Amino acid sequence: LPSFLYAEMVGYNIL
């Protein structure tokens, strides 16, 4: 997965 996509998914999981 692209780094930005992974970061987005992780960010949403934190929220």
Curated annotation (Swiss-Prot):
GO terms for cellular component: extracellular region. Keywords: Hydrolase, Secreted. It is found in: Secreted. Its EC number is 3.4.22.-. Disulfide bonds: none annotated. Found in milt (at protein level). Cysteine proteinase that hydrolyzes basic proteins, such as histones, salmine and clupeine but not milk casein. Shows a preference for basic residues at P2 and P1 positions. This is Miltpain.
